[in-house]
Amino acid sequence: MAGEDHPWQGSILYNLLMSAKQKHASQEEREVRLGAQCWGCACGAQPVLGGERLSGGQARSLLYRCCFCGENHPRQGGILYSMLTNARQPSVATQAPRARFGAPCWGCACGSAEPLVGREGLPAGQAPSLLYRCCFCGEEHPRQGSILYSLLTSAQQTHVSREAPEAHRRGEWWQLSYCTQSVGGPEGLQSTQAMAFLYRSYVCGEEQPQQISVASGTPVSADQTPATPQEQPRAPWWDASPGVQRLITLKDPQVVCEAASAGLLKTLRFVKYLPCFQILPLDQQLVLVRSCWAPLLMLELAQDHLHFEMMEIPETNTTQEMLTTRRQETEGPEPAEPQATEQPQMVSAEAGHLLPAAAVQAIKSFFFKCWSLNIDTKEYAYLKGTVLFNPDLPGLQCVKYIEGLQWRTQQILTEHIRMMQREYQIRSAELNSALFLLRFINSDVVTELFFRPIIGAVSMDDMMLEMLCAKL
C-alpha cells in the first residue's frame, strides 16, 4: 500500500517482529481487555499440514492474527497450540472459581456434539480435538467418551469438596429421631447422658458416633477417645433423678408455720367477706377457694414480707450408729442428757418434711419479684381478685358471672395504675410477670412446707370447707 518492503508471513524475520510487538504492547490495550485471556477466533481452526508445502513455495504459518484482540495465536491442532492449552489449564485464574456457584462446571452439550472417531481418523487428515470450549464457564473441557473425561469424572466423584459435609449437616436434623430411638431404650444411655449426647451432636456441632454398641450401650466411633472425668457434663436442670435433687427443710419451722397460718386466716377472711363472693352458693365458693388458696396465700405472705430460711439435713452415718448401738449393748445404756435427747427428736421431726430445693426456690423467687416491684395495698387486693375469680375452673356453673368479676377487677386495677403511675403499661406488664410466676408454685409443696407440721394428715380441702363454714 505504501510502497515499503515487509517480511513474508511465516519467515524468521516476521516471527521476530511479531514477538517484539507482543512484548511491547501498550497499557491501554491491556486495560481495554475484559481481564480474561483471548482464546482466538475462527481463523485458527484451519488445520496445519505436515511436511507438505503450499502453492507458491510458502510455508504454512503456525500463528494467525486474531480478529478479536489483534494478537497472534497458535493455530488449533498444532504442537504449540497443544502446549499452550495444556499450560493454561493448571494456571487458572483465582477469580474464576469465585464466580462459580460453589461447584465445578461439568461442561455443556458441545462436548457430545462431535463423537470421537476410532482408528480410522477424521476426513482430510485432521486429528480429533479432545477438548472443547464450554458455553457456561468459557473454559475447555474434555469431550465425553474420551479417556481424559473418564479419569476426570471418576476423580470428581472420589475427591468431594470439604464444604459438602458442612452443608449436609444442616439437612441431618432427621437423625435426631433415630438417635432418640437408639439411646432411649433400656439398653441405651441414661436420660441425662442421652440429652447431653443429643445436645452435643446437634447443637454444638460435634461429630456424631457412627455405631452404638448394643452390649455396652455406649457410642463407638473411630475418632472417639475415652472422655476424662473433667470432660463429663454436669447434671442439667431437667434431670429429675433422686440423686440430683437437694432435699431441704425449714430452719425454724415453728415460727414460719405460725406466720403462714396467720396469713391463711387473713386470706380466707378477705375472700369470705367479699360481697360478690358471698352471694355465690357454697359449692361454687368451694370450687374457687380449693383451687386458688395457694396463689392467694403466696400474695398474702409476700405482702406480709415473710422471710424463711432453709437448711439441709446431713446424711446419718450408718457406721457411727452401729458402733453406738454396739456400745449400748455391751456397756449398758448411759444416762442421756436433755440436749442429747431433744436433738434427735427435732431432726427426725424435720426429716419427715423434706422438700426439693427447686420447688422451694420457686416460692422465694415469687417473693423477691413482688418485693422488688414495691406493690402497694390496693394492687395486692386487685391481684387477689384477679386470681380468685378464675372462670376456667372445672365445676363452675356461673361462668359468665365469674368472667364479669374478673374483667371488672382487672379494669379497676388498670384505672388505679393509670392514676398512680405515669408509665402504666410498663407497670401492668410487671404485675403480669409476677402473676406468671405463680404457675410454677405447687399447692402440695405449700402444704408440706407451711402446714403439714400443724395439721398432720388432714387434707387442705377439708380445712377450706371448715374455714368457710366457721366464723372467722
From Swiss-Prot:
Annotated motif LXXLL motif 2, positions: 80-84
Gene3D superfamilies: Retinoid X Receptor
Alphabetical list of Pfam families matching this protein: Hormone_recep (PF00104), NR_Repeat (PF14046)
A GO molecular-function annotation: protein domain specific binding
Stretches for region 4 X 67 AA tandem repeats: 1-255
Domain NR LBD: start-end pairs: 190-471
Motif AF-2 motif per UniProt: ranges: 463-468
CDD domains cross-referenced by the UniProt entry: NR_LBD_Dax1
Region described as Disordered: spans on this chain: 214-238, 324-343
InterPro entries linked: NHR-like_dom_sf, NR0B1/2, Nucl_hrmn_rcpt_lig-bd, Nuclear_hrmn_rcpt, Nuclear_receptor_repeat
Tissue: Expressed in adult cerebral cortex, spinal cord, thymus, heart, lung, ovary, testis, adrenal gland, hypothalamus, spleen and kidney.
Gene Ontology CC, one term: cytoplasm
Family designation: Belongs to the nuclear hormone receptor family. NR0 subfamily.
Domain description: Homodimerization involved an interaction between amino and carboxy termini involving LXXLL motifs and steroid binding domain (AF-2 motif). Heterodimerizes with NR5A1 and NROB2 through its N-terminal LXXLL motifs.
Record's function text: Nuclear receptor that lacks a DNA-binding domain and acts as a corepressor that inhibits the transcriptional activity of other nuclear receptors through heterodimeric interactions. Component of a cascade required for the development of the hypothalamic-pituitary-adrenal-gonadal axis. May also have a role in the development of the embryo and in the maintenance of embryonic stem cell pluripotency.
Assembly, per entry: Homodimer. Interacts with NR5A1, NR5A2, NR0B2 and with COPS2. Interacts with ESRRB; represses ESRRB activity at the GATA6 promoter.
The name this protein goes by in its record: Nuclear receptor subfamily 0 group B member 1
Gene that produces this protein: Nr0b1
